[in-house]
């Protein structure tokens, strides 16, 4: 079923264009853009011939570079070409991207304490050391 397929290139372009139009002149970074699946009730009604075809939607996570921790979530209706939901989300971190992970690995590989810890266990070639970043929530306990 088409509306359960991932976004096409044209749909991706349409979603990003709507977001850019809304944010004209603001310093925003796209963190994540994907298909927003229809609600199960909408899907079942359509499959059973009891409801209309669900609209195609995209879900986006955006980073507002001007605001520390500024994360925005948006739902874009690609059928009607409107942004249906737009909300700032507090106390969250955006999804780690491959760019973020590469940066973390470069920083860790060049950190003197990490280098020494590796040498202490017999590892001298830091290009052979890999790091896996995890997004862990801060816990005050």
Where do the language-model regions lie?
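N- and C-terminal low-complexity/disordered segments
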Residues: 1-7, 49-55, 64, 77-80, ...
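A domain-level signal for the mature, folded cores of soluble proteins
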Residues: 1-34, 44, 100-110, 114-121
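Exposed beta-strand-loop-beta-strand "reactive/processing" segments of non-cytosolic proteins
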Residues: 25-78, 125-141
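Extended, regular secondary-structure scaffolds
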Residues: 80, 89-141
